[in-house]
Protein backbone atom coordinates (compact mmCIF):
# COMPACT_ATOMS: atom_id res chain seq x y z
CA UNK A 1 0.00 0.00 0.00
CA UNK A 2 2.84 2.40 0.84
CA UNK A 3 4.59 1.43 -2.39
CA UNK A 4 1.43 2.12 -4.42
CA UNK A 5 1.07 5.54 -2.81
CA UNK A 6 4.70 6.36 -3.63
CA UNK A 7 4.21 5.17 -7.21
CA UNK A 8 1.12 7.37 -7.63
CA UNK A 9 3.06 10.36 -6.34
CA UNK A 10 5.92 9.65 -8.73
CA UNK A 11 3.65 9.34 -11.77
CA UNK A 12 1.91 12.61 -10.95
CA UNK A 13 5.22 14.40 -10.49
CA UNK A 14 6.89 13.00 -13.62
CA UNK A 15 3.89 12.69 -15.93
CA UNK A 16 4.06 8.90 -16.14
CA UNK A 17 1.30 6.33 -16.45
CA UNK A 18 0.51 4.28 -13.36
CA UNK A 19 -0.10 0.58 -14.00
CA UNK A 20 -1.66 -1.13 -11.01
CA UNK A 21 -0.05 -4.48 -10.13
CA UNK A 22 -3.38 -6.25 -9.59
CA UNK A 23 -6.45 -3.98 -9.46
CA UNK A 24 -6.66 -3.41 -13.20
CA UNK A 25 -8.57 -5.46 -15.78
CA UNK A 26 -5.78 -5.34 -18.34
CA UNK A 27 -3.21 -6.42 -15.76
CA UNK A 28 -5.49 -9.26 -14.68
CA UNK A 29 -5.99 -10.32 -18.29
CA UNK A 30 -2.23 -10.65 -18.63
CA UNK A 31 -1.92 -12.60 -15.40
CA UNK A 32 -4.68 -14.94 -16.56
CA UNK A 33 -2.60 -16.12 -19.50
CA UNK A 34 -0.81 -18.31 -16.97
CA UNK A 35 -3.97 -20.41 -16.82
CA UNK A 36 -4.13 -20.46 -20.62
CA UNK A 37 -0.74 -22.18 -20.63
CA UNK A 38 -2.08 -24.77 -18.21
CA UNK A 39 -5.15 -25.43 -20.33
CA UNK A 40 -3.15 -25.62 -23.57
CA UNK A 41 -0.58 -27.96 -22.01
CA UNK A 42 -3.00 -30.86 -22.33
CA UNK A 43 -2.34 -31.97 -18.74
CA UNK A 44 -5.90 -31.23 -17.61
CA UNK A 45 -8.61 -31.26 -16.67
CA UNK A 46 -7.78 -30.62 -13.03
CA UNK A 47 -10.01 -31.00 -10.01
CA UNK A 48 -8.27 -28.41 -7.85
CA UNK A 49 -6.17 -25.29 -8.34
CA UNK A 50 -4.22 -23.51 -5.60
CA UNK A 51 -3.37 -19.83 -6.06
CA UNK A 52 -1.77 -17.40 -3.61
CA UNK A 53 -3.70 -14.21 -2.89
CA UNK A 54 -2.25 -10.80 -2.15
CA UNK A 55 -4.36 -8.16 -3.83
CA UNK A 56 -6.30 -10.86 -5.67
CA UNK A 57 -5.47 -10.14 -9.31
CA UNK A 58 -3.72 -13.42 -10.08
CA UNK A 59 -6.31 -15.51 -8.24
CA UNK A 60 -9.25 -13.76 -9.90
CA UNK A 61 -7.85 -14.01 -13.42
CA UNK A 62 -6.67 -17.62 -13.09
CA UNK A 63 -10.00 -18.68 -11.59
CA UNK A 64 -11.94 -16.92 -14.35
CA UNK A 65 -9.91 -18.59 -17.09
CA UNK A 66 -9.95 -22.07 -15.58
CA UNK A 67 -13.68 -22.11 -14.92
CA UNK A 68 -14.32 -21.17 -18.53
CA UNK A 69 -12.74 -24.45 -19.66
CA UNK A 70 -13.26 -26.63 -16.59
CA UNK A 71 -16.45 -25.36 -14.88
CA UNK A 72 -16.26 -27.92 -12.09
CA UNK A 73 -12.70 -27.11 -10.99
CA UNK A 74 -12.35 -26.01 -7.37
CA UNK A 75 -10.17 -22.93 -6.98
CA UNK A 76 -8.56 -22.52 -3.57
CA UNK A 77 -7.13 -19.15 -2.61
CA UNK A 78 -4.20 -19.27 -0.19
CA UNK A 79 -3.33 -16.39 2.14
CA UNK A 80 -0.91 -15.90 5.00
CA UNK A 81 -2.65 -16.25 8.34
CA UNK A 82 -1.76 -12.63 9.16
CA UNK A 83 -2.42 -11.39 5.61
CA UNK A 84 -5.92 -12.72 5.02
CA UNK A 85 -7.53 -9.50 3.81
CA UNK A 86 -9.49 -11.22 1.02
CA UNK A 87 -10.81 -14.04 3.21
CA UNK A 88 -11.77 -11.58 5.95
CA UNK A 89 -13.46 -9.25 3.47
CA UNK A 90 -15.53 -12.00 1.89
CA UNK A 91 -16.56 -13.33 5.30
CA UNK A 92 -17.70 -9.85 6.36
CA UNK A 93 -19.31 -8.99 3.04
CA UNK A 94 -17.22 -5.86 2.45
CA UNK A 95 -13.65 -4.85 1.73
CA UNK A 96 -11.79 -4.86 5.04
CA UNK A 97 -8.60 -2.91 5.67
CA UNK A 98 -6.45 -4.93 8.06
CA UNK A 99 -4.71 -3.03 10.84
CA UNK A 100 -1.71 -5.37 10.80
CA UNK A 101 -0.17 -7.38 7.96
CA UNK A 102 2.78 -9.72 8.40
CA UNK A 103 5.51 -9.08 5.83
CA UNK A 104 7.46 -12.35 5.86
CA UNK A 105 5.65 -13.19 2.60
CA UNK A 106 6.18 -9.66 1.36
CA UNK A 107 4.88 -10.22 -2.15
CA UNK A 108 1.36 -10.81 -0.83
CA UNK A 109 1.36 -8.32 2.06
CA UNK A 110 -1.75 -6.29 1.20
CA UNK A 111 -3.94 -4.52 3.78
CA UNK A 112 -7.11 -4.37 1.67
CA UNK A 113 -8.28 -6.25 -1.46
CA UNK A 114 -8.65 -4.39 -4.73
CA UNK A 115 -11.95 -2.81 -5.74
CA UNK A 116 -12.06 -4.95 -8.88
CA UNK A 117 -10.51 -8.12 -7.50
CA UNK A 118 -12.74 -8.38 -4.43
CA UNK A 119 -16.04 -9.12 -6.25
CA UNK A 120 -14.27 -11.40 -8.73
CA UNK A 121 -12.65 -13.49 -5.99
CA UNK A 122 -15.94 -13.55 -4.08
CA UNK A 123 -17.61 -15.01 -7.16
CA UNK A 124 -14.90 -17.30 -8.52
CA UNK A 125 -12.72 -18.53 -5.64
CA UNK A 126 -14.42 -21.52 -4.04
CA UNK A 127 -12.46 -21.78 -0.82
CA UNK A 128 -9.83 -19.96 1.20
CA UNK A 129 -7.08 -21.50 3.30
CA UNK A 130 -4.61 -19.65 5.50
CA UNK A 131 -1.05 -20.78 6.17
CA UNK A 132 1.57 -19.89 8.75
CA UNK A 133 5.10 -18.71 8.01
CA UNK A 134 6.37 -22.07 9.22
CA UNK A 135 4.13 -23.90 6.74
CA UNK A 136 5.46 -21.66 3.97
CA UNK A 137 9.03 -22.53 5.00
CA UNK A 138 8.15 -26.22 4.86
CA UNK A 139 6.81 -25.71 1.33
CA UNK A 140 10.04 -23.97 0.28
CA UNK A 141 11.98 -26.91 1.67
CA UNK A 142 9.77 -29.35 -0.25
CA UNK A 143 10.44 -27.45 -3.48
CA UNK A 144 14.18 -27.48 -2.85
CA UNK A 145 14.30 -31.18 -2.05
CA UNK A 146 12.13 -32.21 -5.00
CA UNK A 147 13.24 -29.79 -7.72
CA UNK A 148 16.22 -27.80 -6.42
CA UNK A 149 14.11 -24.65 -6.81
CA UNK A 150 13.92 -21.94 -4.14
CA UNK A 151 10.77 -19.83 -4.54
CA UNK A 152 10.24 -16.68 -2.52
CA UNK A 153 7.89 -17.08 0.48
CA UNK A 154 4.89 -15.58 -1.34
CA UNK A 155 5.60 -17.83 -4.31
CA UNK A 156 5.53 -20.94 -2.12
CA UNK A 157 2.36 -19.93 -0.30
CA UNK A 158 0.04 -21.82 -2.66
CA UNK A 159 2.07 -25.01 -2.25
CA UNK A 160 1.85 -24.57 1.52
CA UNK A 161 -1.93 -24.44 1.18
CA UNK A 162 -2.02 -27.62 -0.87
CA UNK A 163 0.27 -29.48 1.54
CA UNK A 164 -1.84 -28.35 4.49
CA UNK A 165 -5.03 -29.71 2.96
CA UNK A 166 -3.29 -32.86 1.74
CA UNK A 167 -1.94 -33.61 5.21
CA UNK A 168 -5.41 -33.10 6.66
CA UNK A 169 -6.87 -35.59 4.21
CA UNK A 170 -8.97 -32.92 2.50
CA UNK A 171 -7.54 -33.74 -0.93
CA UNK A 172 -8.60 -37.11 -2.28
CA UNK A 173 -5.82 -39.28 -3.74
CA UNK A 174 -7.69 -39.58 -7.03
CA UNK A 175 -8.08 -35.81 -7.40
CA UNK A 176 -5.80 -34.02 -9.82
CA UNK A 177 -4.44 -30.73 -8.50
CA UNK A 178 -2.14 -28.04 -9.77
CA UNK A 179 -0.40 -25.33 -7.81
CA UNK A 180 0.65 -21.93 -9.09
CA UNK A 181 4.16 -21.21 -7.78
CA UNK A 182 5.02 -17.70 -8.86
CA UNK A 183 7.97 -15.62 -7.72
CA UNK A 184 11.67 -16.20 -7.06
CA UNK A 185 12.61 -12.86 -5.51
CA UNK A 186 14.10 -14.44 -2.43
CA UNK A 187 15.58 -12.07 0.14
CA UNK A 188 18.95 -13.67 0.84
CA UNK A 189 18.76 -12.63 4.49
CA UNK A 190 15.66 -14.83 4.91
CA UNK A 191 17.45 -18.06 4.03
CA UNK A 192 18.72 -18.75 7.54
CA UNK A 193 15.29 -18.16 9.05
CA UNK A 194 13.64 -20.37 6.45
CA UNK A 195 16.15 -23.17 7.00
CA UNK A 196 15.65 -22.99 10.75
CA UNK A 197 11.84 -22.97 10.58
CA UNK A 198 11.77 -25.74 7.98
CA UNK A 199 13.80 -28.02 10.22
CA UNK A 200 16.78 -28.32 7.94
CA UNK A 201 18.69 -29.53 10.98
CA UNK A 202 17.12 -32.98 10.63
CA UNK A 203 19.70 -35.72 10.02
CA UNK A 204 18.95 -36.91 6.52
CA UNK A 205 21.19 -38.38 3.86
CA UNK A 206 21.54 -36.87 0.41
CA UNK A 207 23.80 -38.05 -2.42
CA UNK A 208 25.77 -35.71 -4.60
CA UNK A 209 27.84 -36.78 -7.60
CA UNK A 210 30.88 -34.58 -7.99
CA UNK A 211 33.48 -34.63 -10.72
CA UNK A 212 37.18 -34.12 -10.05
CA UNK A 213 38.53 -32.34 -13.12
CA UNK A 214 42.08 -32.80 -11.85
CA UNK A 215 41.95 -36.58 -11.91
CA UNK A 216 39.05 -36.86 -14.40
CA UNK A 217 37.08 -39.27 -12.29
CA UNK A 218 33.75 -39.12 -10.50
CA UNK A 219 33.32 -39.46 -6.77
CA UNK A 220 30.11 -40.46 -4.97
CA UNK A 221 29.74 -38.39 -1.82
CA UNK A 222 27.21 -38.91 0.96
CA UNK A 223 25.97 -35.62 2.40
CA UNK A 224 24.38 -35.36 5.85
CA UNK A 225 22.20 -32.37 6.60
CA UNK A 226 22.83 -31.23 10.18
Task: Place the predicted regions along the sequence by residue.
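PLP-dependent amino-acid enzyme catalytic core
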Residues: 1-213, 226
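Conserved small/polar residues in nucleotide/adenosyl-binding loops
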Residues: 214-221
